[in-house]
């Protein structure tokens, strides 16, 4: 292999695969990135056996070929180079030689034959075109609710729900649930529900722009194609909890609040909440929402946020970080808080602005004992 590529083009693709590669791996080649030169491009790919990403950049290919090199080291080297052309070639001893301006590097590689094969499109698989900007918005509104506990594998991802008239994403960790849906016209036969693993959701978010996304299933993989790159992930083989009734529950105590004012108040009050629980007390009464937090070791904090609420008083405990996650993603000037009593879940929603297209975003949070 002997190629020349622009530093910026090569760096962009190497940066995107960094999240795929596992830093500590019992299989050495999984720490490597696959480089394949042919035609007028250099293909760049990485996998952890569950999630894979393939991209490419323009290149002048003097001699086609392939090699795998340390993804982390190659990225660090290319990032440090001056803005110039990068000359990469495989030498007779199997090592890779990299030159740029007055810099020269030699790197040990592993043969392409040892690199795992990547998922291909299944024959006859009909892709569905999804609006990229919509999918990116839904991920931003839900991904923080995905559980970090791999043991609860059926919660370790987001449920993607596709229908002819919309796209929805749902995530939960058992303590809170975030649901977001946007109307969209999809060329789809039957409605589709698939569980997208947490890591794949994060990597997809990095790829998404305003351009459409092509999605299809290939054997036991989910495949997303966007901007000339292909992200493939194994499906989660599990049953996502029934969420439909949960997001329909309504509280009779409804307050509308300024999102930024509430977010700032929660952030300040939570500074003196217990470090492990992050619990704060939320008290709703006529004209105001009162937030309090206390810790035997640190002290206590109190702040009120004005609201037009005129119902009966209610007090409930919430995890402050759960509230901040929603408030940071809601994107509207106003949000609504719906409560029933101190022992039932609360519902938060963005308040739609104007008559433009909006996201149906519902965030259900379980209460905490205080």
Regions found by a protein language model. Give the residues of each.
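Structural preference for solvent-exposed beta-strand-turn elements
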Residues: 1-370
